Amino acid sequence: MNILEKKAQLSYWQRIKIAFQYVMPQLYLTRLAGWFAKQQWGAVTHFVIKLFAKKYHVDMSEAAKPNFSDYASFNEFFIRPLADNARPINQNPTALCLPADGRISQLGHIEQDLLLQAKGHYFSLNDLLAGDEALAHHFKDGEFATTYLSPRDYHRVHMPCDATLCKMIYVPGDLFSVNPFLAEHVPNLFARNERVICVFDTEFGKMVQILVGATITASMSTVWAGVINPPRPEKITTWTYEGASAVKLTKGQEMGAFQLGSTVINLFEKDRVQLASHLQVDSPVRMGEILAHQK
């Protein structure tokens, strides 16, 4: 089914929902959400967190701090750590682990330089990687996996394997919502949204892990650089890590976080890994479970 056929099948309210994404003040709403999430209003904050957790069915039994009163702000709640051993890391040395809790949005083979966003929608490696053709070349005919983090999910992101950070790229962009419905109806979504591209060397070849921003994702951070945004510079910014500034991370180690959920995209080189056969589109997943095996 092509895009025009899909549009013809949409209800009136679905069309309004899509149109609103194009006209709403994305940055203003995101800044407002960021301001709100920082506020410490005592009992009011605790009450609103409780309402949020009830609406989205957040499982607080897995959190290191299971009581709503333990969180002074929404930010603290959004990036709440898990209890010890809540997410065991698969220790098979030939296995790569899922970086986050959520659902598989898409996964599979990169067809030359095209990745599947949703049925009927493709986007290019070159666009996703902000025009870095040399970097994109590494992943032609490789494998990819896209994990969507909903508001209910654990919001920290971890490493699929041992790795050495080579480069980080901040790419300014739009702030469309990245929920599955919008992924089906906003072309080139992940390549047009704000994102942080992290490039690693691993025993499985080069690997990219991308944190994709979205509406009301107030900030993205990494453990080596802290909060990346805000501020939100209007140009692409690149950091390189080598020599004394090299950053080494271990399998399962936290590497970053979203202040409210979004999407993580992993890229792997050709003939280096085989994605786990049990993973399907819309599969619920947990950080630490198997994502792929070494070929």
Swiss-Prot record:
Residues at the site labelled Cleavage (non-hydrolytic): G261, S262
A single GO cellular-component term from the record reads:
plasma membrane
**What reaction gets catalysed by this protein?**
a 1,2-diacyl-sn-glycero-3-phospho-L-serine + H(+) = a 1,2-diacyl-sn-glycero-3-phosphoethanolamine + CO2
Membrane-topology annotation of the record:
Peripheral membrane protein
| Keywords from the UniProt entry | Cell membrane, Decarboxylase, Lipid biosynthesis, Lipid metabolism, Lyase, Membrane, Phospholipid biosynthesis, Phospholipid metabolism, Pyruvate, Zymogen
PTM summary: Is synthesized initially as an inactive proenzyme. Formation of the active enzyme involves a self-maturation process in which the active site pyruvoyl group is generated from an internal serine residue via an autocatalytic post-translational modification. Two non-identical subunits are generated from the proenzyme in this reaction, and the pyruvate is formed at the N-terminus of the alpha chain, which is derived from the carboxyl end of the proenzyme.
Recorded GO MF terms:
phosphatidylserine decarboxylase activity
- Pathway(s) the chain acts in: Phospholipid metabolism; phosphatidylethanolamine biosynthesis; phosphatidylethanolamine from CDP-diacylglycerol: step 2/2
Q: Which domain of life is it from?
A: Bacteria
Acetylation found in the keyword field: no
The record's principal subcellular location, in a coarse class, is: membrane
Q: Name one GO biological process term.
A: phosphatidylethanolamine biosynthetic process
UniProt remark on cofactor binding = Binds 1 pyruvoyl group covalently per subunit.
Functional summary from the UniProt entry? Catalyzes the formation of phosphatidylethanolamine (PtdEtn) from phosphatidylserine (PtdSer).
Looking up NCBIfam families in the UniProt record yields: PS_decarb
Q: This chain belongs to which protein, by name?
A: Phosphatidylserine decarboxylase proenzyme
Q: Which organism is it from?
A: Pasteurella multocida (strain Pm70)
